[in-house]
């Protein structure tokens, strides 16, 4: 932001894509931004449970953010998102099944932080949530599982995050990664329609 000449992140409005609504949060924008950063970083971290899952999905979402940032006229952000997409694709060569190297919490939380910080700077938080809906679903599956178990002592999913639920349901690790990646590609196409 400091190098953007103040052209980004002015005001406290948020944009809701697909409906093209703009809502001014006022002072509530600060906790909203904090929530987005913390939630998205942790959601990407929760997604990093299978070989190639987080890196493959993040490569697609980052490439989508390149297109979104160019279409909104933010010509410096494609460099950041392009670097993230390229790094994830390079990392994916060594992280695909069977993985020779693992991302770990530091890598996955950094990726979530970069994606969310860039989206916040461009006021595209909800557009990021559309493209990265897999991250949101993964995080919600953990929240639902823990909350429901504490209340009833029963589980909704076989295991949380939800990618492990599918694994325990008989899906192979590569099938889960492939399906989640295809779903992310479709979500990115939906996000493109919102531009």
What residue ranges belong to the model's regions?
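Membrane-interface helix termini and inter-helical loops of multi-pass transporters
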Residues: 7-21
């Amino acid at each position: 932001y400091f190098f953007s000449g103040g052209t980004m992140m002015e005001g406290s409005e948020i944009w809701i894509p697909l409906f093209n609504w703009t809502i001014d949060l006022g002072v509530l924008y600060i906790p909203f931004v904090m929530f987005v950063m913390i939630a998205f970083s942790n959601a990407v971290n929760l997604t990093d449970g299978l070989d190639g899952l987080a890196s493959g999905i993040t490569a697609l979402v980052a490439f989508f953010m390149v297109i979104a940032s160019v279409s909104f006229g933010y010509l410096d952000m494609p460099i950041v998102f392009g670097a993230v997409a390229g790094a994830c694709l390079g990392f994916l060569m060594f992280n695909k099944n069977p993985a020779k190297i693992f991302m770990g919490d530091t890598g996955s939380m950094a990726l979530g932080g970069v994606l969310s910080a860039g989206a916040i700077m461009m006021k595209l938080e909800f557009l990021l949530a559309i493209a990265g809906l897999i991250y949101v679903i993964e995080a919600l599956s953990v929240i639902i599982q823990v909350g429901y178990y504490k209340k009833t002592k029963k589980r909704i999913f076989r295991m949380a995050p939800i990618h492990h639920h599918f694994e325990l349901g008989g899906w192979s690790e590569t099938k889960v990664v492939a399906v989640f990646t295809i779903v992310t590609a479709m979500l990115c196409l939906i996000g493109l329609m919102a531009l």
